[in-house]
């Protein structure tokens, strides 16, 4: 959305010499606006790198977040610098043609950002309402189509003024004014803000209702399934697990409940994070989309230039604060941000490649005298742990209290055929899983050793994702 100045509204038909620049004001605005632009650019780049460098963030939901960051990055890197120069100088210094192009790119990026939030709200509604069916409903192909629709619709809304849908431009090329043609103002306000806002609010109201209902149901079920053991028991499903009689049905029911609990907890937390993003979006953009139509349809009620500049930059501010919201609201993004800032991205990807597909053997006395490798499973390698109640008939993993690093002592559980041990760094949640494996030759086929695909996730003590 393009800045409007008072002299623009006068519709001057001649080019006036630019007024002298107030140096102190220019320096102050340059520092503030320049810092805001740099923060927005670096923050959105950080979001993109965090998703790109962490396998567990390679999901359709996070691709939507990357799309939002791309739109915000384009806005902060291609539009805001010229807006800041316009604000500092007090006049447009780049000519009429570039003014029109700049205005179109401005509307394109802002609309794409807003519609991206709309797509995210729909995605979160599906994730919370249908957590188990979500992967089949929201596929990568459908996600790509949704993102294409976002950018096509944004392009349609933004290019109207380039084809003449605007009021006559002033002859003074130092004036780059907002398009106040009433028809276009109504069209762009509805398409860029009010329709997406209505969808967002409806989706999050439904998310809230579903989350409250599901939370009550899952909490009541969790109370009946809690174990008396103080140890955290995590199990990994594997095929061809023997079971007897009616225990199969009971195990399936408990497994379904536990998987549903974890998936719902994960979707609920993502919905909370993105709900904060949407709340900030409404606070930032609503004033602008109230002021703009009022000024277009009712010129007598047009706000002052100072008020307009405030709401104008408040809308831009939204594209700079989303990178703050993610780490503050999500441990997942906080860890990803920290890894990128510490330049651990490449090392984590390489470690992940070695960890995935590793064949784990249960600890046994036969392995005691052999060389062992400690396999580091990095958090965020793209896998999932399920916390499931006892007697499920599935492969069991027990995680014990923290042990000093470098300790060679290995705790061997009683049931060596069904579980193996690991160490965790934190008592409250899983940060790093170090599993005991063997570098010895692969056992013979008649040796009953399960080959397990490793699945990891960060879990709280109650089973929720952290």
Swiss-Prot record:
Major localization class: nucleus
Signal peptide location: none
Listed InterPro entries: ADR_fam, ADRA1A_rcpt, GPCR_Rhodpsn, GPCR_Rhodpsn_7TM
Keyword Lipid metabolism attributed: no
Chain positions with Phosphoserine modification: 215
GO BP term (any one): cell-cell signaling
Expression sites (tissue/organ): Abundant in heart, brain, aorta, vena cava, vas deferens, submaxillary gland, lung, and kidney. Found at lower levels in prostate, parotid gland and skeletal muscle.
One GO cellular component term: presynaptic membrane
Subcellular location: Nucleus membrane; Cell membrane; Cytoplasm; Membrane, Caveola
Entry superkingdom: Eukaryota
Entry-listed glycosylation sites: 7, 13, 22
Topology feature Extracellular, residues: 1-27, 89-99, 168-181, 298-305
Residue numbers with lipid attached (S-palmitoyl cysteine): 345
Quaternary structure, from the entry: Homo- and heterooligomer. Heterooligomerizes with ADRA1B homooligomers in cardiac myocytes. Interacts with CAVIN4.
Protein name per UniProt: Alpha-1A adrenergic receptor
Organism: Rattus norvegicus
Lineage: Eukaryota, Metazoa, Chordata, Craniata, Vertebrata
């Amino acid at each position: 959305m393009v800045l409007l100045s008072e002299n623009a509204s006068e519709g001057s038909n001649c080019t006036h010499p630019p007024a002298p620049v107030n140096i102190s004001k220019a320096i102050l605005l340059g520092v503030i606006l320049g810092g805001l632009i740099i923060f927005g650019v670096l923050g959105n780049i950080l979001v993109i790198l965090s998703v790109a460098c962490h396998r567990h963030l390679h999901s359709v939901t996070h691709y939507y977040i990357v799309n939002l960051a791309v739109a915000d990055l384009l806005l902060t890197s291609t539009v805001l610098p010229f807006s800041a120069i316009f604000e500092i100088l007090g006049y447009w210094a780049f000519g009429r043609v570039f003014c029109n192009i700049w205005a179109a790119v401005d509307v394109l990026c802002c609309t794409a950002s807003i519609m991206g939030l709309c797509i995210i709200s729909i995605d979160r509604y599906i994730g919370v309402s249908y957590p188990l069916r979500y992967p089949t409903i929201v596929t990568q192909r459908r996600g790509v189509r949704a993102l294409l629709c976002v950018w096509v619709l944004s392009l349609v809304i933004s290019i109207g003024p380039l084809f003449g849908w605007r009021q006559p431009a002033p002859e003074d090329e130092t004036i780059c004014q907002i398009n106040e043609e009433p028809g276009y103002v109504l069209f762009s306000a509805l398409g860029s803000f009010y329709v997406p806002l209505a969808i967002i609010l409806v989706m999050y109201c439904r998310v809230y209702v579903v989350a409250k209902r599901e939370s009550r149901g899952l909490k009541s079920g969790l109370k009946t399934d809690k174990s008396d053991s103080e140890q955290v028991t995590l199990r990994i499903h594997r095929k061809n697990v023997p079971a007897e009689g009616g225990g199969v049905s009971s195990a399936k029911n408990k497994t379904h409940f536990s998987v549903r609990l974890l998936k719902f907890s994960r979707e609920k937390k993502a919905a909370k994070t993105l709900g904060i993003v949407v709340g900030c979006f409404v606070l930032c953009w609503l004033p602008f989309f109230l002021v703009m139509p009022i000024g277009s349809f009712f010129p007598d009620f047009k706000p002052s230039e100072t008020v307009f500049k405030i709401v104008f930059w408040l809308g831009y501010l939204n594209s700079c604060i989303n990178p703050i919201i993610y780490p503050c609201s999500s441990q997942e993004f906080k860890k990803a941000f920290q890894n990128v800032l510490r330049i651990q991205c490449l090392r984590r990807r390489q470690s992940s490649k070695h960890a995935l597909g590793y064949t784990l053997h249960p600890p046994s006395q036969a392995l005691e005298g052999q060389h062992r490798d400690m396999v580091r499973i990095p958090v965020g390698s793209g896998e999932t742990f399920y916390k499931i109640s006892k007697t499920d008939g599935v492969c069991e993993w027990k995680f014990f209290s923290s042990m000093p690093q470098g300790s060679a002592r290995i705790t061997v559980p009683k049931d060596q055929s069904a579980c193996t041990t690991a160490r965790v760094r934190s008592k409250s949640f899983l940060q790093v899983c170090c599993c005991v494996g063997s570098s010895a030759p692969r056992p013979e086929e008649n040796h009953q050793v399960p080959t397990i695909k490793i699945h990891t996730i960060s879990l709280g003590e109650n089973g929720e994702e952290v």
